[in-house]
Every structure is written in C-alpha cells, then in structure tokens.
C-alpha cells in the first residue's frame, strides 16, 4: 500500500538518517556509503520503488566483490519515507566514490540512486573531486541542479518518468533472470552424471549423434528464446493466460531452428523448447514476489495451457495418428508433456523438486541429488521416450523396478547409477522426457531459492 508522507515526516527521517551516519562514523572511523532513492513527490515507498532499491543494493554488492571489499557494517531500512542502506568500508573514499558514481551514471535506473560517500570526518565526497560532471535531469538530460532549482519540470512529469524507469528496469531484470536460470537448468541437467541412457559427462548414453558439448551449444543458443518467452509473458500479463501460450508457439518454431543450427541438425532440446519456454513465460506473467512459490508458478503454467491436450489431439484417430505422441494417446490415453503442463507439471512439483531439495539438504553433491531426482521422476511418470524405444510393457516394468530400487536407496551412488546407465545403453533406452522434467526441476529450484530478490 502506497502512503503519502508529509514534509515533517521527511525532515524527521532525514534527521534520523544523519544521526545514524554519525553513530557509524564514530564507531568505525571508516568511510560510509549512504544509499537512498531520488523519488519526487509525496509517495516515497512502493513495491516498484523497492525493486529499484533492491537492484541498487545488488549493484553495490557486485562492486564490493569486484573490489574484494567486505563491508564492516551494513544494514537497510524500508519506511514510508523511503528506503535507506548503509555500508561501512575499509577503503579509500575516492575509490568508493568512483564505483558509486559508475553505478549512478551507467543506466537510467542509476539516475534514481543517491549513493553518498561520507569520509570519516563526516564530509561528503563530491563528484567534482573525480572531475565528474554533476547529475543529469531525468527528463531533459540537462544539469539536474538547474532544472530542480528553476522547477522546469512538474512533479507529475518527474513521477511519470520515474515510474517508466523503474518499470523498464524491473522488467529487464526479470526477463534476463528467467532466461539465465533456464539455461542454467539445462546445463545442470546435462552435466548430471551418471544418468541412465542419457547424455552426460560420462558418455553419450543411448545416443550416437550427440554429446555433452552438443547440449551446451544448444543451451547457449536458446538463451534469446527464453528471454523472448519471459518478455512475452510480461507483455501479455494482463491478458487471459491462454493468450500468452498462443503467442509462444511461433517463437518455439523459430527456437527449434536455432537449436538445429547450433547442433548441426540434432534434436537436443525440442521438449525443453516447449516446456521450459512455457515456464519462462509464466515467470514473466507473475510478479517477482511470487517466484518463490513453486506451486504458484506452476499454476500459471496450467492456466496458460488449459485445454491443450484436447485441442492438439482433436480429430486424431487410430487411422490418422502420425506421431509417437498421437499414437500413444490413441492407444493408451497417454497425454505426455501436454498433459504434464496442463496439470501444472505435477511430477516436478510433487516428485522431482522435493526429492532434489531433500538430497541437497542431506548434503549430497549435485550429481547424486540430481540423479536421485531423475530416477524418482522416471519411476513416477510415463516417459514416452522409453515406450518409443521399447514398449509400454517394458516401460511399466521399468517403473516398478525403479520404485523398488528407490524404496531401498532413494539416492543411489555413482556406481549404482553407472551400472544402471550401462543397462539402459544395452537396451537402447533413453528417458528423454524425464530429462526434460529434471531440467524443469532444477529451474524451479533456482527460481524458488535464488530468483527472489531482496525487497
């Protein structure tokens, strides 16, 4: 809820801020960064403003890492009078001022950052000491002091521009993060080793035309597509969810072409183009605060794909079924990945994600936790790739065998997984559908544990 603040409240907040600065300088005798937001008008705090503030703090943390600096003290307050952050650093004040001005000047969002650097004696470091010009106006780009003192622009104009800057920065960060986490998930899936019958660091599984590097090439090529999916979700967020899904389909066709270009014609990620692209679009549709809730993200996936199975299989008969998916649907009622996304990826939410996160919590390395999640997914879903490479009977028998194995050892070790890999290769089995669900499991893990930001 946005609250209008009075001049008295702002003056009181300024007095408290100065007092806190003096206390920190007296305690540490080191330079201090005081970070606030330049927000015009009587509303100084909102979810959008907090997102901008969180991005500013993130950029400061990155500069600290780059300079190998660990703050001696840091804290942040978020009040109706605005957001404030304080950092005490053991470094030269001019060095600190250099990287804070770099942040302020690098992007439009930086124009809303006020990162004061205060020396141990209480004096501020001026931009002029670095031979830098003064801050620029949000509206016209002229000297900010001139525009402010002469009131050249109205409060309404400044508020509109501020909202535009904050919104564009928020959306750009969300879109980039969704795509980054999607590619990261694909890389974690392919590098999980050993995996039965699948490409990994050990071998190419039951495949003759691809290896782990083929998958890396493909994953890298798909980053722009995942950005497009998240952007489409954000741009259509106010429309009915199925409209977002409809807008994805031409993007998916183009992405398949990029994948084939990158791999020399090898189908490495066709399933992921479909399913991971949908999840990226769902993330785009949702406010960032909801990313931490896996069930909410997957509910959006379900809403986007409502009625998909019926639409895609309408008119399909035993006589005209052409694809493996169509034939399995007619013969066994298996809905495959369409049924998974339409139901909100229940195998990911109820099997893959809990098993993966429990394994990581137990201290297992990524390979073992991820391998356990893969087997759990395979044992609790219908992998159409297994059926296509063998039979429905073999797939059913395999799931029962894996359930028995996991009942005794939920997280088989490397030797057990390698032995299973050898068996799958001997039978030419490859659970590609389960591999896609494992990638989605990693994506939801990343989104829920790392996707949320400090607001």
Task: Show the residue positions of the predicted features.
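A short glycine/serine-rich beta->alpha loop
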Residues: 257-270, 362, 422-431
